[in-house]
């Protein structure tokens, strides 16, 4: 099935046009791309390994992808998480931590607190070949050694302190039995 993306201005106003996946995006126009980092009560991050035949095959990343036409950023994050891992999250459970504009993309980074054993995951075989929970420090080591996608390495470079702060807050909240609030 052919996928289409809605086009936006840099300030996220929908242009009323869409473009087919793979087609060049006109200069000054953007589409939405999401990443969603799943963090468990121990403060570990869920990573998925890209299948070898995909771009950056064999590298580790957080769930993510493009918002398809008619879909909000938040809806795309929830959908991508479920498609790639089988983890169900409600829109109200995911927190938009920050956004960044790069090239032709409006990139949105979400975090969700989910405790799911690896053997309960349902991996999307066309995208993902493995999954594991890692500590923040291990994730940084993996990024430094080229084991993650460039996107993950870039998020750590730009917002690593913020990511660590959110992970620490999830761990503290889980111990206290309180809902997580992480405002950046």
Would you name each region that the model predicts?
Residues 1-35, 41:
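Acidic, metal-coordinating catalytic segment for phosphate/diphosphate chemistry
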Residues 11, 40-43, 51, 113-118, ...:
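Short loop segments at secondary-structure junctions
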Residues 32, 52, 74, 82-120, ...:
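Active-site segment of metal-dependent pyrophosphate-handling enzymes
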Residues 33-64:
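A glycine-rich, hydrophobic loop/mini-helix early in the fold
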Residues 57-58, 101-184:
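Nudix hydrolase/Nudix homology domain
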Residues 63, 77, 81:
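Hydrophobic alpha-helical positions that pack around
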């Amino acid at each position: 099935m052919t996928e289409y993306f809605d086009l936006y201005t840099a300030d996220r106003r929908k242009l009323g046009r869409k473009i087919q996946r793979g087609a060049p995006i006109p200069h000054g126009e953007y589409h939405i791309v999401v990443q969603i980092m799943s963090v468990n009560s121990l403060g570990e991050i869920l990573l998925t390994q890209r299948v070898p035949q995909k771009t950056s095959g064999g590298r580790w990343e957080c769930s993510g992808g493009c918002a398809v036409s008619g879909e909000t950023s938040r809806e795309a994050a929830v959908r991508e998480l479920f498609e790639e891992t089988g983890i169900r999250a409600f829109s109200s459970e995911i927190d938009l931590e920050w956004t960044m504009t790069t090239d032709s993309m409006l990139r949105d980074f979400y975090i969700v607190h989910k405790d799911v054993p690896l053997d309960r995951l349902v991996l999307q075989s066309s995208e993902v070949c493995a999954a594991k929970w890692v500590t923040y420090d291990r994730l940084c080591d993996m990024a430094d050694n080229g084991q993650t996608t460039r996107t993950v390495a870039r998020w750590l470079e730009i917002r690593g302190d913020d990511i660590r702060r959110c992970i620490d807050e999830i761990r503290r909240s889980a111990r206290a039995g309180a809902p997580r609030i992480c405002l950046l």
